[in-house]
């Protein structure tokens, strides 16, 4: 097995394991025993059904109005429109990507909504990408300011363990990614 194929297999398995752990932990907050419902899907382009797919996991409970923990592994040709815009795509015959997306909306107005996604992408190059943000109901409350400071301090600590000075680079990317141009504002407390 080629090294890149091993990386693909490991990352895809890791995302599935992570999804299972996140679902198990969130279900513990549901006092009436509500569980995630899972549904598989296929990426169907022009009726081929051979371009990967994933599994949606959705929980509607008493604690969480809606929580989604979704995984996917997709692949296929790179469109001419995207050739050269994605690292490694100029020479690649196609792409492969596997990832997880988590979106949680609690019922309590005191608990913010949270979004997180991460993925492993393979073209002529390969890398991990992703981001996270939180959105409280009242962005300007003193609790939201404390929450924003805590959230960003935790992210900074994680990033700095990975590579010194990387937090601000990644924060700027997330702030751009999570910007809502139609509202001319960042989503939530920034990424």
How does the language model describe each region?
Residues 124-169:
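Compact, glycine/acidic-enriched structural inserts
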Residues 96-98, 127-135, 185-191:
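Glycine-rich, often proline-containing surface loops adjacent to acidic residues and nearby aromatics
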Residues 12, 19, 23, 101, ...:
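Short, well-ordered alpha-helical packing segments
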Residues 163-191:
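A contiguous, surface-oriented mixed alpha/beta subdomain in the mid-to-C-terminal portion of proteins
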Residues 1-3, 190-191:
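A short small-residue
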Residues 3-87:
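Gly/Pro-rich turn-and-neighbor structural signature
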């Amino acid at each position: 097995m080629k090294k890149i194929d091993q990386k693909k297999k490991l990352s895809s398995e890791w995302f599935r394991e992570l999804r299972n752990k996140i679902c198990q932990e969130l279900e513990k907050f549901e006092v009436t025993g509500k569980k995630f419902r899972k549904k598989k899907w296929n990426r169907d382009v022009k009726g081929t059904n051979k371009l990967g797919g994933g599994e949606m996991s959705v929980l509607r409970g008493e604690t969480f109005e809606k929580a989604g923990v979704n995984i996917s592994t997709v692949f296929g040709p790179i469109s001419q429109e995207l050739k050269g815009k994605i690292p490694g795509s100029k020479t690649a015959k196609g792409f492969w990507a596997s990832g997880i997306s988590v979106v949680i909306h609690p019922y309590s107005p005191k608990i913010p909504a949270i979004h997180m996604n991460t993925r492993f992408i393979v073209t002529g190059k390969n890398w991990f990408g992703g981001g996270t943000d939180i959105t409280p109901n009242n962005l300007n409350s003193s609790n939201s300011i404390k929450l924003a400071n805590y959230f960003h301090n935790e992210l900074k600590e994680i990033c700095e363990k990975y590579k010194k000075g990387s937090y601000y680079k990644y924060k700027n990317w997330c702030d751009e990614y999570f910007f809502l141009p139609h509202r001319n504002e960042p989503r939530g407390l920034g990424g």
